[in-house]
Amino acid sequence: MATPMIAGAAVAAAAVAGRYGILAWQAFKARPRVPRMRRFYEGGFQSSMTRREAALILGVRESVVADKVKEAHRRVMVANHPDAGGSHYLASKINEAKDMMLGKSNNSGSAF
């Protein structure tokens, strides 16, 4: 006598769970698309800075104009300035990247 009641309750619970599962899936598929976070370069620094590495550090393309390089340099330096708790090493690499992109430096002038 109790077995049919337990079986009925189990079927009802499965039906309710299935219904809410389907509703949750439909809500998930209908959600607005949120842009994903931008992926950053995960590698380390090269022994001699190249134009490609400088562009990766500043977050610009290799064929960018000088104004965009200066804007990117300012944005990255604000986030990594030593006076705001950033690293002196990173600040020197950011400055070196700006010089490389602007054509002021051919070889690595970094002390690190």
Swiss-Prot record:
Topology in the lipid bilayer: Single-pass membrane protein
UniProt entry keywords in alphabetical sequence: Acetylation, Membrane, Mitochondrion, Mitochondrion inner membrane, Transmembrane, Transmembrane helix
Sequence positions bearing N-acetylalanine: 2
Domain J residue range list: 53-112
InterPro entries documented for this protein: J_dom_sf
Similarity annotation: Belongs to the TIM14 family.
Subunit structure: Probable component of the PAM complex at least composed of a mitochondrial HSP70 protein, TIMM44 and TIMM14. The complex interacts with the TIMM23 component of the TIM17:23 complex.
Function, in words: Component of the PAM complex, a complex required for the translocation of transit peptide-containing proteins from the inner membrane into the mitochondrial matrix in an ATP-dependent manner.
PANTHER family referenced in this protein's UniProt entry, alphabetically: MITOCHONDRIAL IMPORT INNER MEMBRANE TRANSLOCASE SUBUNIT TIM14-3, PTHR12763
Name listed for the protein in its UniProt record: Mitochondrial import inner membrane translocase subunit TIM14-3
Annotated organism of origin: Arabidopsis thaliana
